């Protein structure tokens, strides 16, 4: 996959709920000319849960976005790797996203996230993060 990126929930939510960074993320994605988006099955739960809580009128948009994402199963190896990141101070859900991104690191150009701890941890793991802002 030549133009693939791992998408975490903090970024996915900005594609459903209008936030300050939304126009910059949308412009970056347009400049990438149809990037392939990959994420963990965890994104399904996190995104829909957040949309229902914060912006229920965005539910269809969330489903449309998820239809464009290639989802990875949360396998035992990913949970084992994630536990190591939790031990280093990352939250459980972010650790699962990082371990998932690491599992497909040879296929992706980077991790799209707006989570500061995940940006730091992905850098330590050797995965570049993409955080489009002004």
Where are these regions (language model features)?
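Acidic, PIN/NYN-like endoribonuclease modules and their adjacent C-terminal/linker elements
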Residues: 2-4, 40, 44, 72, ...
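Amphipathic alpha-helical segments within well-ordered protein domains
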Residues: 10-13, 48, 63, 83, ...
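Alpha-helix capping/helix-boundary segments
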Residues: 11-12, 43, 78, 97, ...
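A general structural signal for well-ordered alpha-helical segments in protein cores
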Residues: 22, 44, 48, 59-62, ...
């Amino acid at each position: 996959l030549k133009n693939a990126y791992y998408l975490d929930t903090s970024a996915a939510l900005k594609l459903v709920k209008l936030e300050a960074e939304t126009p910059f993320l949308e412009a970056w994605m347009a400049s990438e000319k149809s990037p392939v988006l990959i994420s963990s099955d965890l994104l399904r739960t996190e995104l829909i849960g957040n949309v229902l809580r914060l912006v229920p009128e965005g539910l269809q948009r969330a489903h449309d976005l998820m239809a464009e994402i290639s989802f990875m199963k949360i396998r035992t190896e990913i949970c084992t790797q994630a536990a190591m990141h939790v031990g280093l101070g990352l939250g459980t859900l972010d650790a699962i996203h990082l371990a998932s991104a690491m599992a497909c690191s040879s296929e992706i150009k980077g991790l799209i996230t707006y989570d500061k701890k995940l940006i730091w941890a992905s850098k330590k793991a050797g995965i570049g993060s993409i955080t489009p802002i002004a």
